[in-house]
Amino acid sequence: TSKIVKPALDAVKNGEIKIIPASGEKTYYHWLNNIEPWCISRQLWWGHQVPVWFDKDGNQYCAVTESEAQEQAGSDVQLTRDPDVLDTWFSSGLWPIGTLGWPEDSSALNQYFPTSTLVTGQDILFFWVARMIMMQLAVRNEIPFDTVYLHGLVRDAKGKKMSKSTGNVVDPIDIIDEYGADALRFTNASMASIGGVLKLDTQRIAGYRNFGTKLWNAARFASLNEANFGVSVPTAKETVNRWIVGETVKTLKEVNI
């Protein structure tokens, strides 16, 4: 494991890969420094089938293709392939290159690998992120990305992970039907934090809906009463003010339809 784990540890320690927020590094180091044996086979209907074949005596032959396994065993030996499939996290660990045509030397692989930033949840930092780093370094001797951005997790009002079995799942469609899409957007944007937990409480959503309604009513009142929107605004002189005006104009061009 040291041949696979150590390069992945070093990539973060020496700054090749940056984890944001930095607190995620502690979790990353903990998992890789205390790594346990991993059973990578699963008895599932779908997945990448384990590349191992057996003869009638139980001898096993690991190969990329069946023809290679047959060559190892001999042409007169009857082989049966292992019916198990690879664990999902093992298969997805090769996602950065597997989606780009690897193991072939494709144009897509040369163009898009490695990438720059991976945006993902903090809960799969080890299950997916660390394994992608380990596998790409082992297979390609390259890091798959240079930045890992851990976004927050949306949980229920008590901070518990949403689960169908628990019955605490909040359907955004139901929220939109009751409070409106803008209220849900406002709530998520106002509570967003890097790598944190967003406790989705309908009372908070209702509060932002009411606030948004006040803004809408005020704007509508001004519009109906012929408010003068053409008022002369003094020219910004300070650098920071000119920057604010410039950013506002750019935003208006992008979002004002």
Predicted regions and their residues:
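Structured secondary-structure scaffolds
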Residues: 1-229, 234-235, 241-257
